[in-house]
């Protein structure tokens, strides 16, 4: 069992380490012209502001749900049961960390992929940058998920004396609840990112169409329209971070 646990934590750390390596590699690439850097920075600032505010809202919801879980399981087991609530919070932290890294790499990789295509005119070089940027999100999802499961098992598997089969059978109810609450914690962040980012994107998209094209006669997806920047902010949060976390 100890060997399997070591394998799990090593796999998680390798995934996160390689994700960090690719993150740094993509960030070192040239952003391109001043105009490209200006637009990318505007999207980056907007995405940071959006996800920071969103995570504050998630934090409030998480605290409320954790308290409810503690109350429900305490009544169910006839004693104060804090374990499922802690596992729920661990899941939230792991998922939020993966989502934040995914959003950051998206805002860095987008402009660098465009600049690589502009400079090299080579699809292979362009895809290499795109895949390296995309791998960061994928590796972080797997790495943080494994790290969270490792923590849940180490803290509550060993801590609740559920190493042997018989002991695990005796305490399977609370341990199963711990795993379920961990998964729910991961899912709730994905839901907020996906739904919140999607609504934000659609609102900005409609605003850009109605005001930009209809009233101001600005072409679609023109960066002079602030709603276009907001649309791209929502894409980075909802379509990159949110969609990746759902899987």
Where are these regions (language model features)?
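Hydrophobic, small-residue-rich transmembrane alpha-helices and their short perimembrane loops
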Residues: 2-247
């Amino acid at each position: 069992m100890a060997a399997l646990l070591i394998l799990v934590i090593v796999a998680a750390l390798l995934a996160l380490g390689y994700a960090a390596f690719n993150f740094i590699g993509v960030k070192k690439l040239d952003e391109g012209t001043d105009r490209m850097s200006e637009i990318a920075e505007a999207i980056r600032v907007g995405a940071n502001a959006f996800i920071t505010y969103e995570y504050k809202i998630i934090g409030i919801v998480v605290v409320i749900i954790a308290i409810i879980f503690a109350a429900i399981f305490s009544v169910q087991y006839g004693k104060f049961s804090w374990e499922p609530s802690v596992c729920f919070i661990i899941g939230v932290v792991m998922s939020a960390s993966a989502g934040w890294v995914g959003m950051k790499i998206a805002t860095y990789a987008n402009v660098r992929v465009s600049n690589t295509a502009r400079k090299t005119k080579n699809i292979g070089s362009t895809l290499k940058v795109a895949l390296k940027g995309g791998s960061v999100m994928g590796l972080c999802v797997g790495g943080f998920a494994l790290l969270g499961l490792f923590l849940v098992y180490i803290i509550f598997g060993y801590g609740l004396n559920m190493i042997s089969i018989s002991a695990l059978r005796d305490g399977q109810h609370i341990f199963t609840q711990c795993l379920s609450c961990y998964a729910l914690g991961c899912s709730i962040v994905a839901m907020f990112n996906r739904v919140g980012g999607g609504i934000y994107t659609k609102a900005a998209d409609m605003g850009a169409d109605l005001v930009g094209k209809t009233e101001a006669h600005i072409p679609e997806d023109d960066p002079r329209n602030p709603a276009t920047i907001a649309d791209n902010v929502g894409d980075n949060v909802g379509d990159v971070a949110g969609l990746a976390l759902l899987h």
